[in-house]
Swiss-Prot record:
One of its GO terms (molecular function) is structural molecule activity. The coatomer is a cytosolic protein complex that binds to dilysine motifs and reversibly associates with Golgi non-clathrin-coated vesicles, which further mediate biosynthetic protein transport from the ER, via the Golgi up to the trans Golgi network. Coatomer complex is required for budding from Golgi membranes, and is essential for the retrograde Golgi-to-ER transport of dilysine-tagged proteins. This is Coatomer subunit beta'-1. One of its GO terms (biological process) is intracellular protein transport. Keywords: Cytoplasm, Cytoplasmic vesicle, ER-Golgi transport, Golgi apparatus, Membrane, Protein transport, Repeat, Transport, WD repeat. Its main location: cytoplasm. Oligomeric complex that consists of at least the alpha, beta, beta', gamma, delta, epsilon and zeta subunits. Belongs to the WD repeat COPB2 family. Disulfide bonds: none annotated. It is a peripheral membrane protein. Residues 850-920 are annotated as: Disordered. GO terms for cellular component: COPI-coated vesicle membrane; Golgi membrane; membrane coat; mitochondrion.
Length: 920
């Protein structure tokens, strides 16, 4: 059966001819040496060039990373080896290494050695700790030495490939080869070692269009791979997968099964001839160098093949080797969230096929391994073969039966004792099957659920499925798609009644068999159920759990990790990474149980469970309750003061919020509480909160609204002390303390504003402030200072200046007088004429009467002379009457005016001055 291998292109970049490629072990970098003489480092994640080195004008045929030194070493046709620091771009070393073109450089995995091979038929060993001294020369080939490579299982030996048609195996300590393989009919271009521990193999590629697999212990050819139509220029045993990769000048890359040597796939990206193949241990990425650029592909999935049973025993497959560990062997005090568990790994055995999936049955007694189109069922303890067969996919039922998908049109169901029960041929193309409570078959755009006993259709659902997870109870199922997952409830009783009643079921199945509970827009990578709680890792590598549609993030994972299982007695969920490191995280079973009971509406039972949840997890419970609209309960459960304060504010529980604010003594809390108290009409509490929060603007609003003059006085002093001059000014102004306002403006260096205010409210202070203004302005612009006019010097420039001076003393008597709010009605109906306007009216009346008197005088002079004295007496009486009326005119201060304007209130027959008491 064919090897099921996903191949995804991850990087493509056109360039000059690529002669060699290499992958960085930790950075997402590809190193490419070009025929044009340039070295390029590409980031395959961002698809951008990171570094570029102009090495020479001749071809650079080989380059490698030396990651432990942050170096790149390159050999070129100018016969020089160059070493660069890829971080600083500095050139570390340049030296002439050979007498002809340098074909290959190879870096020792642990020692400070670099091998180089050349068209001068020599291989040289260089030691960078000795200043790149040539410590050894290996002679023996009779033609160009095309490639050298270290043996990963014995780094003291290496192999060389030459156009003299041979492969030679060397020891670092000896100048002579250990042995020679007459490998091909034509020149050998490339060689690579098998990295697995079970086969002493190497592979070669030749100009005779073939690749050959050799056993270097028996010195025999194991297999010849035929299929390329031109020279084979690159060969590779993949370090992680059971495949061989060959590249040829025919433009194709062929993928062969490393065990069966069957051709699995052929890649052709249309970039002309293939010159190089690069890979790295621990990664499934493969980079290919062509005439016209580079391609990187990812082969298969990186999910580790592993399974954990309910007791904490883990079995995993690495290549064909099977290993086991037991989580219970680690003490509870040695387990820390997010840390790798120090587990003792035991070798359990080997597998006859390459495992692509591995899964325990529900009771943990058996383990199935599936791959290469076959399956084998082993006993979990002794690893004995119990059953086998053909299968593209294998799934367990919840009670120990199993099903296999042999093809898209044939599915077999087996009993608990591994006997075939039934063969099903679906009417559609079944691309996947899933086990669990029901047998599920998937096409490209829908899934169908069947019962295990009779394989009767239960329900068809139109959804594209990536994976499916059943809860242990069999009542809940999670269906994961590419972008979201759905939680469905399986109505077992409804299905049973349909079957028992013999009702007809159409092609859509039983409509009420499933009930959609919720949908979450997150991609599930791996998942499992614990009770009614669905635990999963998402596409952002966060470990989440979902209860009743409420998603909670447990941890942010720092690398890709995959769920193994949950141990209830430890209250921990376990994950594994691709390096088979096992990591545990705490997830309390009592917490899950509590949330489940709340979702079911069983609050009484939930409250009984609550005490079993440790206090440090109560905030998580409170957040959950709040999300369910149970804010009162959340306040009772929460322990974090900040969170409790937010809940108390949300509920309007001012007393609780105040107690928290008193303990915290946090300004923001006092301010927030003050605003709520103000809006709730709790003015005393609002005042207290604003004072604690130093919310002077809020206090100004409060005191001005209440008409609290004493509060305004205290606030003015506090604001001035705190440097809040705007608030202090408003307080003083509303209190009528104009002199203090002027002093505050002057102290704040707002002298122009002080002068303007004095002109309006204290004319007698204008000259004094203008003098200050001049002195201050002289420092900046003497000419501008001279242009300032003092009203004492130039009264003609100030309109009604004498009127203002006359009114100042009278206004001073009423300034600062604040009638109580209870007297508002007696003031509201009064005339709101300002003092200045009243004074103007008086002046106009006086001038009119004076003009009228002048006219009478003129008439008397032209008439009888005897009447002159009588007319004078009349004028004197009239003048005395007017003077008396003026003194009796009424003056009223407008209590609603913030500038303390004086109002005139009177009538034609009687005028009287009324002064409002001064405000303080």
């Amino acid at each position: 059966m064919p090897l099921r291998l996903e191949i995804k292109r991850k990087f493509a970049q056109r360039s000059e001819r690529v002669k060699s490629v290499d992958l960085h072990p930790t950075e997402p970098w590809i190193l490419a040496s070009l025929y044009s003489g340039t070295l390029c480092i590409w980031n395959y994640q961002t698809q951008t060039m990171v570094k570029s080195f102009d090495v020479t004008e001749l071809p650079v045929r080989s380059a490698k990373f030396i990651a432990r030194k942050q170096w790149v070493v390159a050999g070129a046709d100018d016969m020089f080896i160059r070493v660069y620091n890829y971080n600083t771009m500095d050139k570390i070393k340049v030296f002439e290494a050979h007498a002809d073109y340098i074909r290959c450089v190879a870096v020792h995995p642990t020692l400070p050695y670099v091998l180089s091979s050349s068209d001068d038929m020599l291989i040289k060993l260089w030691d960078w700790e000795k200043g790149w001294l040539c410590t050894q020369i290996f002679e023996g080939h009779s033609h160009y030495v095309m490639q050298v490579t270290f043996n990963p299982k014995d780094t003291n030996t290496f192999a060389s490939a030459s156009l003299d048609r041979t492969i030679k195996i060397w020891n670092l300590g000896s100048p002579d080869p250990n042995f020679t393989l007459d490998a091909h009919l034509k020149g050998v271009n490339c060689v690579d070692y098998f990295t697995g521990g079970d086969k002493p193999y190497l592979i070669t590629g030749s100009d005779d269009h073939t690749a050959k697999v050799w056993d270097y212990q028996t010195k025999s050819c194991v297999q010849t791979l035929e299929g390329h139509t031109h020279n084979v220029s690159a060969v590779s045993f993949h370090p992680e997968l059971p495949i061989i990769i060959t590249g040829s000048e025919d433009g194709t890359v062929r993928i062969w099964h490393a065990t069966t040597y069957r051709l699995e796939n052929t890649l052709n990206y249309g970039l002309e001839r293939v010159w190089a193949i690069g890979h790295i241990k621990g990664s499934r990425r493969v980079v290919i160098g062509y005439d016209e650029g580079s391609i990187m592909v990812k082969l298969g999935r990186e999910i580790p093949v592993a399974s954990m049973d309910n007791s904490g025993k883990i079995i995993w497959a690495k290549h064909n080797e099977i290993h086991t560990v037991n989580i219970k062997s680690v003490g509870a005090d040695e387990v820390t969230d997010g840390e790798r568990l120090p587990l003792a790994v035991k070798e359990l055995g080997t597998c006859d096929l390459y495992p692509q999936s591995l899964k325990h049955n529900p009771n943990g007694r058996f383990v199935v391994v599936c791959g290469d189109g076959e399956y084998i069922i082993y006993t979990a303890l002794a690893w004995r073969n119990r059953s086998f067969g053909s299968a593209l996919e294998f799934v367990w039922s919840s009670d120990g039966e199993h099903a296999v998908r042999e093809s898209s049109t044939k599915i077999k169901i087996f009993s608990k004792n591994f006997q075939e029960k039934k063969t099903v041929r679906p009417t559609f193309s079944a691309e996947h099957i899933f086990g669990g409570t029901l047998l599920t078959m998937c096409s490209s755009d829908f899934i169908c659920f069947y019962d295990w006993a009779e394989c009767r259709l239960i329900r068809r659902i139109d959804v594209t499925v990536k994976n499916l997870y059943w809860a242990d109870s069999g009542d809940l199922v999670a269906i994961a798609s590419d972008t979201s997952f759905y939680i469905l409830k399986f109505n077992r009783d409804i299905v049973s009644s349909y079957f028992d009643g013999g009702k007809q079921i159409d092609e859509e199945g039983i409509e009420d068999a499933f009930e959609l509970l919720n949908e979450t827009n997150e991609r599930v990578r791996t998942g499992l159920w614990v009770g009614d709680c669905f635990i999963y890792t998402n596409s952002s590598w966060r470990l989440n759990y979902c209860v009743g549609g409420e998603v909670t993030t447990m941890y942010h994972l720092d690398r890709p990790m995959y769920l193994l299982g949950y141990l209830a007695n430890q209250s921990r969920v376990y994950l594994i990474d691709k390096e088979f490191n096992v990591i545990g995280y705490t997830l309390l079973l009592s917490l899950i149980e509590y949330k489940t009971l709340v979702m079911r509406g069983d609050l009484e039972q939930a409250n009984e469970v609550l005490p079993s949840i440790p206090k440090e997890h109560h905030n998580s419970v409170a957040h959950f309750l709040e999300s369910r609209g149970m804010t009162e309960d959340a306040l009772e459960v929460a322990t974090d003061p900040d969170y409790r304060f937010e809940l108390a504010i949300q509920l309007g529980r001012l007393a609780v919020a105040k107690d928290i604010a008193v303990e915290a003594q946090n300004e923001s809390k006092w301010k927030q509480l003050g605003e709520l108290a103000m809006s709730s009409g709790k003015l005393d509490m609002a005042e207290e909160c604003m004072r604690h929060a130093m919310d002077l603007s809020g206090l100004l609003l409060l005191y001005s609204s209440l008409g609290d003059a004493d509060g305004m006085m205290k606030l003015a002093a506090l604001a001035k002390e705190q440097g809040k001059n705007n608030v202090a000014f408003l307080c003083l102004f509303m209190l009528g303390q104009v002199e203090d306002c002027l002093h505050l403006l002057v102290e704040s260096n707002r002298i122009p504003e002080a002068a303007l205010m004095a002109r309006s409210y204290l004319p007698s202070k204008v000259s004094e402030i203008v003098a200050l203004w001049r002195n201050d302005l002289t420092k900046i612009s003497p000419k501008a200072a001279e242009s300032l006019a003092d009203p004492e010097e130039y009264p003609n420039l100030f309109e009604e200046w004498q009127v203002a001076l006359s009114l100042e003393n009278r206004a001073a008597e009423t300034r600062g007088v604040h009638p109580p709010a209870g007297d508002y009605c007696s003031h509201a109906d009064r005339d709101h004429t300002t003092l200045v306007d009243a004074f103007r009216i008086m002046q106009i009346e006086e001038e009119g009467r004076l003009e009228q008197g002048d006219v009478l005088d003129e008439v008397g002079e032209e008439g009888e002379d005897g009447e002159e004295e009588e007319e004078e007496d009349r004028q004197e009486e009239s003048s005395d009457g007017r003077q008396q009326n003026v003194e009796e005119e009424a003056v009223v201060v407008d209590a609603d005016s913030t500038d303390g304007a004086v109002l005139v209130n009177g009538n034609e027959s009687e005028e009287q001055w009324v002064l409002t008491p001064p405000q303080e």
